Amino acid sequence: MALREGPTPARFLPEGLVFCVEGNIGCGKSTLVKALMERVAGSGVNVVEEPVDQWVNHNGKNYLELSYTDPTGYAVPFQNLVFDSYVNVQRLQNPDIMERSPMSATRVFCAVNGSRGVIPATALPGMAARGEAVMRTIATRPVFVYLELPPEECLRRMRRRDRTGEAGVGLDYLRLLHERYEAWLSSAEDVERVDASRSREEIVDRVIEILCRRHPRLRAPLTRKSQL
């Protein structure tokens, strides 16, 4: 994947501090991140969605969908594409708040695909090293905001939204992802847990409270009159 060119925007938060919204497929990350983007529009806070657009149309192929329908053939190319896309995120968007991160790509998705045998064991150490190297270019002091939701509810939400490329995702896979998320974030250094079974408004309010508490400078842009 060719790295994209362009100016790197200034950050709102101190260098190295990034809030990463994490959680299983279907837990509500995109909805939350879009709400935060609306709240801070024009304030200089860089809120960045997961770079799915770079995965669903790369050289004419939907690598996200292929990673589900043909994991043996596409799990490794897809994960490498994910890492490249996060390099572009850092260079062109320089996030203060971001949806997922290179760490979850390695600690969750690569680990699950390794356990399923679709990523060779010999490839895992190199992929983990690359993911963590990319992460260090984005954040040296990440705070993980973890949206907790049972995999059964994640599946119900996925089926309702019927997003392109997700038809091949089943409950067993979601359970594996959930287990890996729990194992990783139970021992991670800086994690804020959020009950994602609450209403959209309650989740947004809870996350705003966390962000303002963790860095008071975010209070002004996040507590302006809601545009939601």
UniProtKB/Swiss-Prot annotation:
Signal peptide: none
Intrachain S-S bonds: none
Source organism per UniProt: Ictalurid herpesvirus 1 (strain Auburn)
GO BP term, pick one: DNA biosynthetic process
PANTHER family the record matches: DEOXYADENOSINE KINASE (PTHR10513:SF35), DEOXYNUCLEOSIDE KINASE (PTHR10513)
Residues that bind substrate: 68, 79, 109
Enzyme category, top tier: transferase
Active site residues per record: 50 (proton acceptor)
Any GO molecular function: thymidine kinase activity
Keyword terms: ATP-binding, DNA synthesis, Kinase, Nucleotide-binding, Transferase
Residues reported to bind ATP: 23-30, 157
InterPro entries for the chain: Deoxyribonucleoside_kinase, DNK_dom, P-loop_NTPase
Protein name from the UniProt record: Thymidine kinase
Keyword Kinase: yes
Annotated transmembrane regions: none
Protein EC: 2.7.1.21
Domain of life: Viruses
Pfam families according to UniProt: dNK
Family to which this protein belongs: Belongs to the DCK/DGK family.
Lineage per the UniProt record: Viruses, Duplodnaviria, Heunggongvirae, Peploviricota, Herviviricetes
Catalysed reactions, as listed in the record: thymidine + ATP = dTMP + ADP + H(+)
